[in-house]
Amino acid sequence: MQQIHPAGQATLLADTRNTLGEGATWCDRTRALYWVDIEGAQLWRCRADGSDLTPWPMPERLACFALTDDPDVLLVGLATHLAFFDLRSGAFTRIVEVEPELPTRLNDGRCDGSGAFVFGMKDEGAEPPRAVGGFYRLNADLTLERLALPPAAIANSIGFSPDGSKMYFCDSLVREIFVCDYRPGGEVANVRPFARLTDPDGDPDGSIVDRDGGLWNAQWGGRRVVRYGPDGVETDRVAVPTAQPSCTALDGEGRLYVTSARVGLSDDALADDPHAGGVFVAQTRHAGMATARFAGTPRG
């Protein structure tokens, strides 16, 4: 039996109390953590110690984003479309609308090693959500293509192996993370199970892949982050002192950052979980990779 390394408990870094914190992303150039509050329609940033906490309001819900080569420009995935956002001026440059014919919104996304942005959708037309949303790739030339992956109700856990040959993803309503072969042009093949959640509580949410090829998955409702090795076997576990951890990021020194959410919690639950929606941090034994950046520019 493979040993599970208890990586300790995460502690509160920023008491932001986001409604739906997501999209944790570490920038090695600015030495800062970025994330979103989807339902609060905000982008957030802070330093590794939680200082210099800065929010930016968005014109609609912000679900995901990517760094670019310009530290002051992000690719942002708003609920209905993709755009460039200038942190200095607050200006948006619209790129493309996504799934206008469906009651879906953008959800999770990460860049691949070639600088394309890969993301998935969330159904908002039914409760529980239906598996109708696609997975997409925005190329550096700003063309959009749908990946040949099964549709999802709540697309999540998107990430890539260190060599770029594998893509990870999940539907949060299915308690399993999948992996597929991934080629530079965005071709996907050989979809197969990667890791199944075995605890009685918790659903797979956002993930990050470390330098050693391990995938750190935030497990919504499970109060934990679990690391799965490249073989899909659990190796590490971090307890998170809030009910709904939502997404993960790693810096180059092995610090694990975890966003969380308040949405859906009752007043009694929030009284017992006052820092829900905050950002948490834990030290791990695995360093993060440099975050892949979107290779496109507002000029295409």
Curated annotation (Swiss-Prot):
Sites binding a divalent metal cation sit at E22, N156, D205
Which InterPro entries does the UniProt entry name for this protein? Answer: 6-blade_b-propeller_TolB-like, SGL, SMP-30
Task: Give me the reactions it catalyses.
Answer: L-arabinono-1,4-lactone + H2O = L-arabinonate + H(+)
Which principal EC class is assigned to this enzyme? Answer: hydrolase
Q: Which residues form a coiled coil?
A: none
Q: Which UniProt keywords apply?
A: Arabinose catabolism, Carbohydrate metabolism, Hydrolase, Metal-binding
- Look up the record and name the cofactor or cofactors this protein needs: a divalent metal cation
Name a GO molecular-function annotation: gluconolactonase activity
List the GO biological process terms: L-arabinose catabolic process to 2-oxoglutarate; L-ascorbic acid biosynthetic process
What's the EC number here? Answer: 3.1.1.15
- One Pfam short name: SGL
Hey, what's the signal peptide range on this chain?
none
The record's annotation in Gene3D superfamilies points to: TolB, C-terminal domain
* Highest taxon, organism lineage: Bacteria
The entry's free-text remark on the cofactor is:
Binds 1 divalent metal cation per subunit.
**What family is reported?**
Belongs to the SMP-30/CGR1 family.
Q: What does this protein do?
A: Catalyzes the cleavage of L-arabino-gamma-lactone to L-arabonate. Is involved in a degradation pathway of L-arabinose that allows A.brasilense to grow on L-arabinose as a sole carbon source. Can also use D-galactono-1,4-lactone as substrate in vitro; however, the enzyme is probably not involved in the metabolism of D-galactose in vivo.
Protein name as annotated: L-arabinolactonase
Quote the gene name from the UniProt entry: araB
